[in-house]
């Protein structure tokens, strides 16, 4: 799922600026799982903000509300009334949730309280590892389930560069070479023929905002 990390208190305080009534909106989805923006984190951040404002003798109110999923308007029930009484909103959701919150309340300044970092897995509580860049052209079928876009420092599509040495990346001796691992994985599966065909490079240029409509919903959203 999406992984995020909380912004510094200083940056958040600077964002809310002169606004007197702050509503901090958390998300019970991805950011809750990675301990960055769920109900508990909303409570903790609000406590820090109240202490800060009290020390600075700034008279501000800080309220909190957590929706199950901030990236889906169906879960915004109960938030409208609270948002109406706030001067500004803080979002502890990922970038997508923050933007939907801003779209829902266009007359309210919305400030992110977390930085969205990557799409990844849980290795252990508090330890997360990037696995996907959401490139839109998944190549895992021929790389043994190892993503070269994410794992390779150069994002190479057709084997390792000349700097790989004993299974390590030239960027750092502690970094495994993605293509070495891909080779080992495919060899174990007797699928080394996957490496023989040349794959076209990723088309990164001229990218615009992407929209996904799943199969079966085309007619519903046809223009």
Can you annotate each of these PLM segments?
Residues 63-71:
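Short beta->alpha junction loops
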């Amino acid at each position: 799922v999406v992984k995020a990390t909380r912004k510094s208190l200083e940056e958040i305080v600077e964002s809310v600026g002169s606004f007197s009534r702050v509503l901090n909106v958390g998300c019970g989805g991805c950011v809750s799982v990675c301990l960055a923006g769920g109900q508990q984190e909303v409570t903790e951040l609000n406590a820090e903000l109240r202490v800060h404002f009290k020390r600075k003798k700034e008279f501000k109110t800080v309220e909190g509300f957590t929706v199950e999923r901030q990236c889906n308007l169906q879960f915004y029930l109960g938030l409208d009334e609270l948002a109406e009484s706030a001067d500004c909103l803080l979002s502890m959701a990922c970038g997508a949730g923050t933007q939907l919150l801003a779209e829902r309340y266009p007359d309210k300044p919305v400030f992110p309280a977390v930085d969205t970092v990557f799409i990844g897995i849980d290795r252990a509580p508090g330890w997360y590892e990037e696995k996907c860049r959401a490139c839109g052209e998944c190549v895992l079928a021929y790389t043994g389930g190892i993503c070269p876009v994410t794992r390779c420092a150069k994002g190479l599509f057709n084997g390792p560069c000349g700097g790989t040495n004993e299974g390590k990346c030239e960027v750092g001796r502690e970094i495994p070479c993605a293509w070495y691992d891909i080779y080992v994985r495919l060899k174990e599966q007797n699928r080394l023929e996957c490496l023989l065909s040349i794959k076209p490079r990723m088309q990164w240029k001229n990218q615009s905002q992407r929209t996904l409509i799943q199969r079966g919903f085309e007619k519903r959203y046809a223009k």
